[in-house]
Each structure stands twice: as structure tokens, then as C-alpha cells.
Amino acid sequence: MVMMAVLMADTGMTVLLAQGIANASGPVFPLVSPFIGLLGAFMSGSNTNSNVMFGLLQVETARALEIGPVTIASIQSIGASVGSTMAPTKVLVAAAVVGLAGQEDQIFRKVTIAVLALVALTGIEAMILVTLFENWTR
């Protein structure tokens, strides 16, 4: 994953994708940002890997929208932290540890509802932060 992220950064793919996301999302990007973090953590099972995969994308999108890159990077990491709890590998291990092997689907459903709610709240908070404290978040 690190090599893929480096390749994308060095070839300009990340900047190109960031410009596309900035054009598509516009001022609501802070609302979308934690969901990108969640996606990376869900795919990789790790906050760190999500940040490696999507951190630069988030920062470049923030720069394109003239939003503070540190603010957006923080929001990415929050989304990834919360999202990693619903990674299939973590649900599988947790079910096995507490003696609920075979019930992963039920656990996943319950965890998904909570995670999506928390990430949505994070996005709403991010929108409020960026909107109200626009000059502080740059």
C-alpha cells in the first residue's frame, strides 16, 4: 500500500484525483472527508494504512478548496479510527475472542450502524468547524 501511495503521489495521480473530488464535492467536502477515511480503514483494517492510502488525497483536496490541510487530515484520521472498528478482520477476531464465532454478520450489522452514525456526526462537526472557524482552519 505504501508503494501504491508513493507511485500515485510521484506521478501526479493524487493531485488529479484531488482536483476531481474538489470539483465534485465543493464546499461539502468536510462532510465527505471522514467517510473517505472510513473506506480506507474498512479496506485495510488499519487507521495507519488508511492515512497512507488517502492522507495525501485529503490534503491535496483541502488545498484545492482552500481549507486547512491539517484540519482535513485530522478529520480523515478520525474517520479512519472509527471506521477501523468495522473492518472485517477486526470483527472476525473480536467474535472469536468472545466466543461468538459464526455470528459475525450480526455483530457487523450492529457495529456498522454505530460506526456510520459516528462518522456522519464527525462530518457534520467538520462542516461546522470549517464554516464557523474558516480563518483558523487554514
Tell what function each PLM region has:
Residues M1-M8, A24-L57:
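Hydrophobic alpha-helical transmembrane segments of multi-pass integral membrane proteins
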Residues M1-M4, E60, A64, A117-A120:
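Small-residue-rich segments of transmembrane alpha-helices in multi-pass membrane proteins
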Residues A5-A18, M43-S46, E125-T137:
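Transmembrane helix-loop junctions in multi-pass membrane proteins
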Residues G26-P27, L57, T61, T112-L118:
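Small-residue-enriched core segments of transmembrane alpha-helices in multipass membrane transport
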Residues S81-R138:
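Juxtamembrane and boundary regions of transmembrane helices in multi-pass small-molecule transporters
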Residues M43-I75, E104:
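Hydrophobic transmembrane alpha-helices that form the pore/transport pathway of multi-pass ion
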Residues V28-F42, L65-T89:
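Alpha-helical transmembrane segments of multi-pass membrane proteins
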Residues G12-P27, L56-L57, L65:
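Membrane-interface interhelical connector segments
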